[in-house]
Amino acid sequence: MEVYQNAALSPEERAKDLLGKMTLQEKVGQLNQRLYGFRIYEREDEEFTLTEEFKEEVNRMGGLGALYGLYRADPWADKDEKTGIVLELSAKAYNMVQKYVIEHSRLGIPMMMSTECPHGHQALGGGLLPVNLAAGATFDPELLLEGYRACGKQLKSGHVELALMSALDVARDPRWGRSEECYSEDPCLAAAMAKAAVTGMQSTGVGSVAKHFCAQGETTGGVNASAARIGERELREIHFPPAKACCEAG
């Protein structure tokens, strides 16, 4: 047994040994999360097959660092109950994908999994919460914390390590089509709710990636991903509080 495979040793010892054995290409491969998980498989009845795109990517990089959105199913992903991964087939699909990654990694390194959690688990059979704007209207951070704790447990059961959570945006223009992903137009309330969401999720051992960027809610003309025409003071007073709260939550 190699040192990095010995579960009795500390994570630091195992990681140091593993890094010492990896090539530069393999290290780069561990930073790779280019693939959309919902595009790496085809489903027919209850059977799954991996796409050539997925196999080529794993083989090219000598492994795969992380896979985004394996369970995602919505019109954007073009997956539904007939073509996507329903809850009762999720373990089967995950095991197939992870097995391929491990067997085609020289050092047997498993991949991480990340998934969208804009308001609960964005998957077939996933538990959903009210959209953020509705959650913010409750003025109840503790209730939201419990909701994301339940969500985190579901993600954990699906072997998801990273939850991509809408938590940083402050609603500044109702014309913006993603305003429902904001907890509030008030930075104090938005910060309290964001901190609760991250705390609830991470209490289950699932890491939180708070999205999207500071001041994304400060759109120009309500256009998504447009420039934020603000000064430093507004950035600090309005848009930094949710980000700071998420950092304080760990």
Q: Where do the protein language model's features map onto the residues?
A:
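Glycoside hydrolase catalytic-domain context in secreted enzymes
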Residues: 1-250
